[in-house]
Structures are given as C-alpha cells and as structure tokens.
C-alpha cells in the first residue's frame, strides 16, 4: 500500500494519552487549522515483516469509508521508525454514556444512536467491508453529538466466498456461529453485534456477558432459548459444533426483560438476534423497520446527552492500555 507523504511538522503533539504494545497515541493539533487530532505513532521496528496488518487494514478501509458516521482518516505519513496515522479526535464514546447512571436515556435518544450506527454500518457494508468489532467503546461521539464507527483493525473485505477468521468480534457481541468455527460469513455477524448494542442501550448493562467462550454460548441460550431444529442442523456442519441440551426461552420472552420497550423495539431486536445469520436484516433493512418511522422521532445529535473533555481523554487512554495493542480502537429525520 502506498503511504502518502506528509510534512510531519504539519502536526503538533500536545501530550500522550495512551500507549499499547505497538503504538503510542498523542493528542495533537493540525497547525494550519488548529484542529484537534489523534496521532497514532506505530512502531514499525516491532514487526519483523514490516507494518502490522491491522494498521494497514485500518488505513485501507478508512480511506474507502468516508462518511458522517465513520471516524475520519485525516492523514497518513511515515518516518524511519514510525507510521503515523492522523485521525479526527473524538473524546467520548457510547460506553461512557451507557455507564453514566446520572444520564437518563430517553427512547428518542436510543433511536438516534441506532440510526447513526446503522447508517455508518450500511455505508461500510455497501463498500463490502465488515467491521468485525462493533461494541459501545468503538462507537465514538463527536463534540456535536454525532456517533461514528471507529477501530477498523479487525475489519476486512467480503463478497466472494473466502476463508475468514472466526476469532473476531469481542466475546459479548460475537454471534454464535463464530463460536462454532464458521469461516464463511457476511454482514450478519455485524448485525448480531448491533442487536447486542441495541439491547445494552435499553438495559444500560451488557445483555450477554459471558465469562468464557463456552460460557458465552450458555449465556446466549439462557437468554434466547436454544436454536430451532432447522438452525441446529446447519450448525452441526460447523467444525466446532458442540451438542446442546434444549433450553426453552425465558418465561415472558424478551418482553419480560425489556419491559419498557415497545413492540417495535422488541421486533427489531429479535430480527437482529436471529440464530440464522441469513435471516438477520441488513443495515439498510433495519433502517427501514417501522421502529424508526414510529414516534418518537430520533433526537437531533446536537441535543443528545454527551460526555467528554478531560474525562473523555482519560477514558481513551485507559481503554488503549486495557487493549495493550494496536489499534485503539434510510431517510430518517432527526428532531
């Protein structure tokens, strides 16, 4: 991949906000515009075969994915020892908002975040890119409330049958077919993650928090019941399939747990968390669901609750240290 040459003096490093095994992240500014940016300095010398593949993927896919709901790749340039990726700086994310119990989520807030998530996802899927690591702390929030997909280090292109890794997507947001070793998949894996995020926005806590890969399947089955025989039959063809004892759906179904949700929310959630990945809606089909046309209308991004500033910068830093690796991470009107 050709790396565009840029004058390294175009950017001023202000302070380090995080460090992983292969990268250091600085808060900085673009000299000419005084714009705040995040500067990822990737230590090229750490990789005997050149640059880490996740860095190249992030650059490639962000170049192909310019959209209001995808983090902007501002610039890329290299020095003798580092590859420098310049990104727009976003000091808040959806996880911060979910965890802040002093912030009250209104149904219109949740609908707005879901619209922006699905719009960004539809955009990358239309360019045959799977994200493969959707979760609340990879959904960043701008100063004017716009949600943006970030952290494309696990992304890859799709379209023709290929042998893809099943060891992707953070456990709590990973669909069951990947635990069973499925290596040929499409947009359905991202849509399962979106369903888990939708549930988390309504519950204000992770919906399917398994403690291990094996436990994760048990958590999913206890929450949704075991799959129907037709789906089990297709799962039996997967290399890591494990026999499962029948578990019925919980009493009252999803409606009992999501008691504040309406029929539209429950219907969309069930579609996204379908065991059959081919029955899960695409991002565009989800945007066309009647949930988004029903009242209330989604809140305008500028009116959404948000956090940021120093607290957000500290969160970015601690998140990168926890990962200890590179990288960090429909026609609907708002009212």
Curated annotation (Swiss-Prot):
GO terms for biological process: cell division; positive regulation of transcription by RNA polymerase II; positive regulation of transcription elongation by RNA polymerase II; positive regulation of transcription initiation by RNA polymerase II; regulation of cell cycle; transcription initiation at RNA polymerase II promoter. GO terms for molecular function: ATP binding; cyclin-dependent protein kinase activity; cyclin-dependent protein serine/threonine kinase activity; protein serine/threonine kinase activity; RNA polymerase II CTD heptapeptide repeat kinase activity; RNA polymerase II CTD heptapeptide repeat S2 kinase activity; RNA polymerase II CTD heptapeptide repeat S5 kinase activity; RNA polymerase II general transcription initiation factor activity. ATP binds at residues 17-25, 40. Its EC number is 2.7.11.23. The active site is at 133 (proton acceptor). Coiled coil: none annotated. It is found in: Cytoplasm; Nucleus. The keyword Transcription applies. It comes from the Eukaryota. Keywords: ATP-binding, Cell cycle, Cell division, Cytoplasm, Kinase, Nucleotide-binding, Nucleus, Phosphoprotein, Serine/threonine-protein kinase, Transcription, Transcription regulation, Transferase. The modification Phosphoserine is found at residues 162, 165, 318. Pfam families: Pkinase. One of its GO terms (cellular component) is cytoplasm. The keyword Signal does not apply. Its main location: cytoplasm. It catalyses: [DNA-directed RNA polymerase] + ATP = phospho-[DNA-directed RNA polymerase] + ADP + H(+). Gene3D superfamilies: Phosphorylase Kinase, domain 1 (3.30.200.20), Transferase(Phosphotransferase) domain 1 (1.10.510.10). Residues 11-292 form the Protein kinase domain. One of the nine subunits forming the core-TFIIH basal transcription factor. Interacts with mcs2 and tfb3. Protein kinase essential for cell proliferation, where it is required for completion of cytokinesis. Phosphorylates the C-terminal repeat domain (CTD) of RNA polymerase II. Belongs to the protein kinase superfamily. CMGC Ser/Thr protein kinase family. CDC2/CDKX subfamily. PANTHER family: CELL DIVISION PROTEIN KINASE, CYCLIN-DEPENDENT KINASE 7. This is Serine/threonine-protein kinase crk1.
């Amino acid at each position: 991949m050709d790396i565009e040459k840029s004058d390294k003096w175009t950017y001023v490093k202000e302070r380090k906000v995080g460090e992983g095994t292969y990268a250091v992240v600085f808060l900085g500014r673009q000299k000419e515009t005084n714009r705040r940016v995040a500067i990822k300095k990737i230590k090229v010398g750490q990789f005997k075969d050149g640059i880490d593949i996740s860095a190249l993927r992030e650059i490639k896919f962000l170049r192909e994915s310019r959209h209001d709901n995808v983090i902007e790749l501002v610039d890329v340039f290299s020095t003798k020892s580092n590859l420098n990726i310049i990104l727009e700086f976003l000091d808040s994310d959806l996880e911060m908002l979910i965890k802040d119990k002093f912030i009250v989520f209104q149904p219109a807030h949740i609908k707005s975040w879901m619209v922006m998530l699905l719009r960004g996802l539809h955009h990358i899927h239309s360019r045959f890119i799977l994200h493969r690591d959707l979760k609340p702390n990879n959904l960043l929030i701008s100063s004017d409330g716009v949600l943006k997909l970030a952290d494309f280090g696990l992304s890859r292109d799709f379209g023709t049958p290929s042998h893809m890794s099943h060891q992707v997507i953070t456990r709590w947001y990973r669909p069951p077919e990947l635990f069973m070793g499925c290596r040929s998949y499409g947009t359905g894996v991202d849509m399962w993650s979106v369903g888990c995020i939708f549930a988390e926005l309504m519950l204000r806590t992770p919906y399917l928090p398994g403690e291990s890969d094996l436990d994760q399947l048990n958590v999913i089955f206890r929450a949704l019941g075991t799959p129907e025989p037709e789906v089990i039959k297709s799962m039996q063809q997967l290399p890591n399939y494990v026999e499962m004892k029948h578990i019925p759906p919980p009493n009252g179904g999803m409606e009992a747990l999501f008691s504040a949700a309406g029929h539209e929310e429950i219907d969309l959630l069930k579609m996204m968390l379908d065991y059959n990945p081919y029955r899960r809606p695409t991002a565009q089909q989800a945007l066309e669901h009647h949930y988004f046309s029903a009242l209330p209308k989604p809140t305008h991004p500028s009116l959404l609750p948000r956090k940021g500033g120093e607290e957000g910068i500290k969160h970015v830093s601690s998140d990168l240290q926890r990962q200890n690796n590179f990288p960090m991470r429909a026609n609907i009107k708002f009212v």
